[in-house]
């Protein structure tokens, strides 16, 4: 298995496509090897879950507000009916400083809609230093394809 030894093929395809869909074995291990190989090649890596991502561009690059989950009937006296808004720093704020390329690895990518996945591809096109890897589910062996190719099927 030369891929697990070097990761060059994956890195080459990631650099050319910008946005990759990965199907990894459910036992785990393959994705962490690839992340380690990418870090060794000079990439900054950020691992995150795709659940609750919202608007990808705002969540990744801009300061944005979040609200607590709705917990049923509550008194309106403590705040607005929608709850208190808290400001959160962007996920990739610190990672995008400098000149190093950044890989965002999203777990549980199968919960994202087609429009959210295409928005991630557009982000990679607009910001050439950003590369996105989305885990789209499990497979018997590690395989990947460009996310645009997956969306066109």
UniProtKB/Swiss-Prot annotation:
Species: Synechococcus sp. (strain CC9311)
Family to which this protein belongs: Belongs to the complex I NdhN subunit family.
EC number: 7.1.1.-
Catalytic reaction(s) noted: a plastoquinone + NADH + (n+1) H(+)(in) = a plastoquinol + NAD(+) + n H(+)(out); a plastoquinone + NADPH + (n+1) H(+)(in) = a plastoquinol + NADP(+) + n H(+)(out)
The protein's name: NAD(P)H-quinone oxidoreductase subunit N
GO annotations of cellular component type: plasma membrane-derived thylakoid membrane
SUBUNIT field: NDH-1 can be composed of about 15 different subunits; different subcomplexes with different compositions have been identified which probably have different functions.
Annotated InterPro entries: NAD(P)H-quinone_OxRdtase_su_N
Database matches in PANTHER family: NAD(P)H-QUINONE OXIDOREDUCTASE SUBUNIT N, CHLOROPLASTIC (PTHR35515:SF1)
Subcellular localization(s) per the UniProt record: Cellular thylakoid membrane
Record membrane topology: Peripheral membrane protein
């Amino acid at each position: 298995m030369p891929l697990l030894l070097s990761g060059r093929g994956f890195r080459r395809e990631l650099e050319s496509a910008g946005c990759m869909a990965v199907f990894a074995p459910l036992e785990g291990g393959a994705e962490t090897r690839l992340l380690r190989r990418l870090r060794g090649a000079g990439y900054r890596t950020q691992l995150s879950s795709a659940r609750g991502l919202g608007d990808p561009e705002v969540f990744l690059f801009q300061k944005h507000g979040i609200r607590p989950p709705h917990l049923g009937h509550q008194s309106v006296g403590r705040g607005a009916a929608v709850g208190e808004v808290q400001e959160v720093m962007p996920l990739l704020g610190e990672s995008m400083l400098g000149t190093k390329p950044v890989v965002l690895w999203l777990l549980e990518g199968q919960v994202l809609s087609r429009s959210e996945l295409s928005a991630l591809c557009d982000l990679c096109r607009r910001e050439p230093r950003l590369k996105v890897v989305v885990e789209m589910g499990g497979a018997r062996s590690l395989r990947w394809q460009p996310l645009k190719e997956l969306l066109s099927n």
